[in-house]
Amino acid sequence: MRLRNNANAPLYLKSQHEYIINDPHLLKDNLGKIFKNPELPLYIEIGMGKGDFIIENALRNQQINYLGIEKFPTVIVKAHKKALKHKLDNLAMICFDANKILELLNSESVDKIYLNFSDPWPKKRHAKKRLTHPCFLEKFAVILKQNALVEFKTDNENLFMYTIYDVLLKDLTKYEILFLTYNLYTLVNNVELLKNIPTEYEKKFVMQGERIKKVNFRFLKNNQ
């Protein structure tokens, strides 16, 4: 269910200086103004939603910097208010459209990308809006470091099948699948489940008996 639009959200974000990045150029030019330890690995979540996943990651892994990207101001306000309950030097958030991600981040500057429960855009004519469409993946390949991973989770069967069969397996010269499951929560004692941090949507889907699908992949050397 979508949140009711908060007309004051853009103004709220502009007034905030803790966790919120209001100058996108800082991510390319001066990470030291964003993170206390800018030399740490950088993991990003595209479409961070209300922030449960990325905030918990930042709490558990102080040795990694986390950047949450979300294009809807109303949603990122919710995430920001959750983050304010903690004192974290390794977390930042920005309201930004992933279509323009090459304007936001330098080449080979990112160590991992998380795509969690992205909008499935079910209609064929909207396929290019899917975050696992090749037009997005080509951009992700530019900002990712050598051998860096993309981790993709979804409850949506059609989006997952599209990602696996129409994208990743369609060109084996571009992508390498390192982990794949059609039902993450059945993998008892598997490291992927043991380390899993659920998003707010994921918790609801699991309670409803939905199968959570996941794939980890990377871009092959000659295509980065």
Swiss-Prot record:
Organism the protein comes from: Ureaplasma parvum serovar 3 (strain ATCC 700970)
Protein name in the entry: tRNA (guanine-N(7)-)-methyltransferase
Family indicated by similarity: Belongs to the class I-like SAM-binding methyltransferase superfamily. TrmB family.
Any one Gene Ontology molecular-function term assigned to this protein's record: tRNA (guanine(46)-N7)-methyltransferase activity
Active site (catalytic residues): 119
Gene giving rise to this polypeptide: trmB
Catalytic reaction(s) noted: guanosine(46) in tRNA + S-adenosyl-L-methionine = N(7)-methylguanosine(46) in tRNA + S-adenosyl-L-homocysteine
The EC number(s) this enzyme carries: 2.1.1.33
Role noted for this protein: Catalyzes the formation of N(7)-methylguanine at position 46 (m7G46) in tRNA.
